[in-house]
Structure formats: C-alpha cells, structure tokens
C-alpha cells in the first residue's frame, strides 16, 4: 500500500512493483493531480481515497488487511494525525512492514521539517559544489532516487525478517 507522493517514496513503491509486487497506490484528492500520476507510479494499481474522512479510513483499513507493506512519506506526525502512523497500523497488523521516507529522517534537529530534493541539496551544501558561480540545483534527483531505492532495500530486508520471525517492522 503506497501513500507516497513526489519522488523518493513513490520510487520505492515503483521499484517494488517492477520486481513483481502488487502495489496499490492510494492517491489523495487533496494532492495536485500533477503529483499523483507520474513515472514513479507505473506498474501500480491506483485508488483515490480521502484519508481525512471516516469512509476513507475504512477503505484504507480494508486494503491493509491483506497487505504486506505500507509506505508513506509524510512530514513527521502527519501519518499519525491521519490515523495511519506506524503504531496505529501495527496495532491492527502486528506483522506489517511499514516504510517511512522523509527528507530529514525521524530523529534530530531537522526531523519534522518538510522538504524534498532541492531543499536537501541546499542544506547538504551540494548546490554550491556543482561548479556554477551561483548555487544551483543538480539537473537530476539523485538523492530522491537513491533514497527510494534504499527504502526498497530496507522494505525487502524487513520482509525477509518477517518471513523468518513472523514479526513486522
């Protein structure tokens, strides 16, 4: 179940779909259409669900009943506010593998800040090292693609752990 938007999170789900997973992309009616239907969603089935409604949450839980993985890339605290955070999902599905991707991680002084590739490049100092006289953004999203691939790797390892122990992560 893929709740992700933009690039890093959806890249994880797309890679899983390319390797044969049945990925259900849950799109939000609150997200601009341009962010819902791009290259990173190929190979996925898609459904439009408003997680901010009771009916939407009921549909989410119905889908999660038979899922192996839930992916999200919300800003810190947003998944919990929507009722789809790790502990909330784990309470219903203790064996679930829950992948969470964001720009700054879940710990540290930047946790909870919104961000995506260009912001991450600026904070990391990458924009001043690209050879231009003025800070510039790299012409490709190496960090987002790399993050998505590493998230996929982490999900695969968590699935292997679950297969061996029965425990979700």
Predicted stretch roles:
Residues 15, 19, 82-169:
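Active-site-adjacent "lid/gating" segments in soluble enzymes
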Residues 9, 78-80, 106:
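Short glycine-rich, flexible loops that bind phosphorylated cofactors or substrates
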